[in-house]
């Protein structure tokens, strides 16, 4: 019974970590990374389709992404979607593929992105703390309903806190690594 509360909290915290990793993947660090285009959706035959499902995305050079559509007729739609996206990179269409040259980041841009990383990391920690609160509330509810004893409640609260501390430490590590990656020249 008590383990179910902890397992549910762990699972939700893992989802927070995965979400944070996806968010960090979308923050460009001055080098090509296919995950920059994960959030780009293309209007393809009237349906919003993720870019990676209608084109292959390769990295021929350190700062170049190459988008090769599976269907050449979708090239203009892909270019339109890339222009409309918030990635901040202008696509170059050469008729059969689209090149995205990632510009070198200025010092100011690096600092701004580092601030963004901190903000995203802090939001992830808030989400983890909310998960902890939900788990603690569930444990207290079970103690009130006499499903667990007061001693079991104290042990459970300590276990939940340990899981939370581990999750927050993991988020701090992820944030520090992303900041380091951004601030490297």
Swiss-Prot record:
Gene3D superfamilies, per the entry: 3.30.1360.40, Ribosome-recycling factor
Cellular component terms per the entry's GO annotation: cytoplasm
Keywords: Cytoplasm, Protein biosynthesis
A GO molecular-function annotation: ribosomal large subunit binding
SUPFAM superfamilies assigned to the protein according to its UniProt record, in alphabetical order: Ribosome recycling factor, RRF (SSF55194)
Similarity section: Belongs to the RRF family.
Function: Responsible for the release of ribosomes from messenger RNA at the termination of protein biosynthesis. May increase the efficiency of translation by recycling ribosomes from one round of translation to another.
HAMAP family per the UniProt record, alphabetical: RRF
Protein name per the record: Ribosome-recycling factor
Origin species: Streptococcus pneumoniae serotype 4 (strain ATCC BAA-334 / TIGR4)
Gene that specifies this protein: frr
């Amino acid at each position: 019974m008590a383990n179910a509360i902890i397992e549910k909290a762990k699972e939700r915290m893992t989802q927070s970590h995965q979400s944070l990793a996806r968010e960090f993947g979308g923050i460009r660090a001055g080098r090509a990374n296919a995950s920059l285009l994960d959030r780009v959706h293309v209007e393809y035959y009237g349906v919003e389709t993720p870019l990676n499902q209608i084109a292959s995305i390769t990295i021929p050079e350190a700062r170049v992404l190459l988008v090769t559509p599976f269907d050449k007729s979708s090239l203009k739609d892909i270019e339109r979607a890339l222009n409309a996206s918030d990635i901040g990179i202008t696509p170059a269409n050469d008729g059969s593929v689209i090149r995205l040259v990632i510009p070198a980041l200025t010092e100011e841009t690096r600092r701004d992105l580092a601030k963004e990383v901190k903000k995203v990391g802090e939001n992830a920690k808030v989400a983890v703390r909310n998960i902890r609160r939900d788990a603690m509330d569930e444990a207290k509810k079970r103690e009130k309903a006499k499903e667990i004893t007061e001693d079991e409640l104290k042990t459970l609260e300590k276990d939940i806190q340990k899981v939370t501390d581990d999750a927050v430490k993991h988020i701090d590590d992820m944030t520090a690594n992303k900041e380091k990656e951004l601030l490297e020249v």
